[in-house]
């Protein structure tokens, strides 16, 4: 992780402490009035700790880990992968948000591209951590620009947030859209072309 922060001398952000996570879940169950030793909840702290290790796996990955393989194919037209499933966790309430991401880029003048599946893996790197959708969108776009050095990038993310659906305003089905454009895709005509491809069904 970049710039790790020490927590009272007990570890650094970026280190997963499974036992500590179990204890925290147990304390949370007690705090809401449950009995963590009753049948049905006895193994819940361990299960939740293991689930969090998977759900937040992106904390222990870097974008370079998934974008290391590139190909110089001389391709200079837009590459776009649509409808990449997004599963993430709102950092404000620690409840899920889910939806899709559309990720496109115009390769560098050398024609350097990456595998299509790598774009989906890049989305996962940033989605599998405590997150907000706005930052998620920006991080995907900035990583592509930095690592692939394309002439342009567009990222559009559309998600439903459980923190709006199951609590608070309670509006299930409401979708949030965020976008980030970089380089040549800031050009109106090029951006419109990309958006028409994204919106086409």
From Swiss-Prot:
GO terms for cellular component: cytoplasm. It comes from the Bacteria. Its EC number is 3.5.4.16. GO terms for molecular function: GTP binding; GTP cyclohydrolase I activity; zinc ion binding. It catalyses: GTP + H2O = 7,8-dihydroneopterin 3'-triphosphate + formate + H(+). Zn(2+) binds at residues 90, 93, 163. HAMAP family: FolE. Belongs to the GTP cyclohydrolase I family. This is GTP cyclohydrolase 1. It comes from Streptomyces coelicolor (strain ATCC BAA-471 / A3(2) / M145).
């Amino acid at each position: 992780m970049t710039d790790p922060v020490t927590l009272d001398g007990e570890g650094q952000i970026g280190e997963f402490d499974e036992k500590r996570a179990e204890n925290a879940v147990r304390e949370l169950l007690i705090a809401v009035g449950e009995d963590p030793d009753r049948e049905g909840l006895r193994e819940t702290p361990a299960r939740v700790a293991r689930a969090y290790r998977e759900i937040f796996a992106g904390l222990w990955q870097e974008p370079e880990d998934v974008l290391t393989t590139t190909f110089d194919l001389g391709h200079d037209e837009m590459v776009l992968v649509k409808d990449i499933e997004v599963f993430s966790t709102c950092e404000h309430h620690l409840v899920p948000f889910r939806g899709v991401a559309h990720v496109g880029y115009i390769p560098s003048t050398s024609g350097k591209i990456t595998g299509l599946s790598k774009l989906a893996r890049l989305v996962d790197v940033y989605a599998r951590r405590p997150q907000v959708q706005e930052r998620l969108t920006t991080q995907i776009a900035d990583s592509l620009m930095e690592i692939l050095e394309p002439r342009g990038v567009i990222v559009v993310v559309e998600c439903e947030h459980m923190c709006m659906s199951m609590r608070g305003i309670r509006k299930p089905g409401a979708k949030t859209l965020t976008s980030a454009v970089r380089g040549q895709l800031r050009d109106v005509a090029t951006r419109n072309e990309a958006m028409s491809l994204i919106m086409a069904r």
